[in-house]
Amino acid sequence: MGKKKSDESAATTKVKPSGKDASKDSKKEKLSVSAMLAGMDQKDDKPKKGSSSRTKAAPKSTSYTDGIDLPPSDEEDDGESDEEERQKEARRKLKSEQRHLEISVTDKEQKKREAKERLALQAAESAKREAMKDDHDAFTVVIGSKTSVLEGDDMADANVKDITIESFSVSARGKELLKNASVRISHGKRYGLIGPNGMGKSTLLKLLAWRKIPVPKNIDVLLVEQEVVGDEKSALNAVVSANEELVKLREEAEALQKSSSGADGENVDGEDDDDTGEKLAELYDRLQILGSDAAEAQASKILAGLGFTKDMQVRATQSFSGGWRMRISLARALFVQPTLLLLDEPTNHLDLRAVLWLEEYLCRWKKTLVVVSHDRDFLNTVCTEIIHLHDQNLHFYRGNFDGFESGYEQRRKEMNKKFDVYDKQMKAAKRTGNRGQQEKVKDRAKFTAAKEASKSKSKGKTVDEEGPAPEAPRKWRDYSVVFHFPEPTELTPPLLQLIEVSFSYPNRPDFRLSNVDVGIDMGTRVAIVGPNGAGKSTLLNLLAGDLVPTEGEMRRSQKLRIGRYSQHFVDLLTMGETPVQYLLRLHPDQEGFSKQEAVRAKLGKFGLPSHNHLSPIAKLSGGQKARVVFTSISMSKPHILLLDEPTNHLDMQSIDALADALDEFTGGVVLVSHDSRLISRVCAEEEKSQIWVVEDGTVNFFPGTFEEYKEDLQREIKAEVDE
């Protein structure tokens, strides 16, 4: 690290702010540092069979000189007649016109093809947006023997704030997600809804928001799942306007004030001043109850907690990226304070500080909260109960995530023990060949289950007290996944260095990283922290070689292989290919009898189901695409891993698998993440770990552990929320 000179095996890139050397260096070909990106977004430029561009292409030349006006050779007859000269000139002119015509046709065809591709891309994006729209009719909810209606239970008590539905089933386009499940949501509690991806957690939130699962009419429900639509309204106004009642009362008060006096001070509508005054007083009382005087201040406080500076708060919402607009949607929900707030992965678009602020804010939430999250620390801090979606059912556990884990493990052992006894008895009954004996074993098991369920309910236990009808014991099915990165070959240090590097974007005068002096070797563990927009991803791009420093020097070993993961890489996958085709194209040198089977085995290790291996990547979920990217990184056999928000598309089991794999990996790891637990796992060894703080255009080392850095942030945030 620092200004240490590179050894002979290292490649050095020097960049000066000005001069011939800087110009010369900028023209050098930039080496790719990630094998997985080699063809990520390349297109096949070969014309397709039967395409218009091929049918109108120029005829094949018989010689490389065809169509080129050449000077006459020394052997040509100098005594050519004028007629021959004119004929020759005419032939040259005709050939030139034909060539220009061919070029013109080719240009037109190229433009047509580009226009066609643009239209196809727009159509694909439109289809994608259409597919993302929620189709209410695609979901079927059956409660007991009746199907739910969108408006909820007409007989709901106006004072009821709890939601209790027994024995309901949910299916989506024919796929059963929940079977004979029961839900119990008590007012004032904060629930964490957990389970593997694709099992129906987000669907359950949507059904509650749509009231297809009956919700008492007096309970207002708000689900935060989509970013706010960008327009000219400022971020602050967008948050305040989320309270429609407040906005309406303000408009009524303003209109009444205007109508109460004309240009001469008399009432335009002819109403008595006393009546107008009474109406205004009533409106002001209602506005005071809604906290109108402090509305903007409260909205500003929420936005600040989510990372918006004062300048950002007055910017138009249309000027923000999707991630920031998602924060505005979250701020709107927190400002409105619905009776039932539903959050689906709220931390995905937040930096670490914003996540810690949201934890502190939600811990003070007095109403009901149901949140889907794969962040263990977030669930431990915020939640008072856990709902586990497992095996098409909902299991309730008191306490936070740690409490759930201990309860879950105990439950798993008990269930497997009961199954082993039942399975042994059933096998013995089958050996007798007596079907009646088999039915007796099954009935006895059901009776025992019903007795235990009744006993648990009478004791007031929260685990499955509203459970489905008793069934015979089944083998407990756990979802598990294992990630693995191969052992890297040893390289002589230093592997990668940035020495006195500065960087700025040509079109971003407000952004600059200055005097960056960092390095990475085998075994190095780095967590990059700092607010969104400070330059964390830019720093990773500089380390990867995807950006060239404006000033300073980058050194890297010539044999260095870097594995790069970004939350946006899943969008760069070639959607028309299958995962197997994609990986074989990037990594053709596979060992074994069958290259395809070798690739499928690797995909399986990273948790991609076998039926997705040969499906187009476009049909995969975000989490499944992430698994394809991680598989590709593993196949590139990297020495250093650069990971930018790797948990956004992963469920909890996959995050744990990633943490285990990084713990075993002997190469270098540089991590940007809002997941505190993952950072703690990666930076567990203090001697090998570093915390780089990117803020105010600089990269500084935090003199302590990640836990100490986190505690400092939490103290600051608590003081802010207490104000």
From Swiss-Prot:
Bias (Acidic residues): 72-84, 266-275
SMART domains per the record? Answer: AAA
Q: Where is this region: Disordered?
A: 1-117, 256-275, 427-472
Q: Which GO terms describe its cellular component?
A: cytosol
Which keywords annotate this record?
A: ATP-binding, Nucleotide-binding, Repeat, Transport
Ranges of Polar residues compositional bias? 50-65
Residues that coordinate or bind ATP = 195-202, 530-537
- The record places domain ABC transporter at 163-423, 496-721
Q: Which family does it belong to?
A: Belongs to the ABC transporter superfamily. ABCF family. EF3 (TC 3.A.1.121) subfamily.
**How is this protein named in the record?**
ABC transporter F family member 4
Per the UniProt record, the lineage of the source organism begins with: Eukaryota, Viridiplantae, Streptophyta, Embryophyta, Tracheophyta
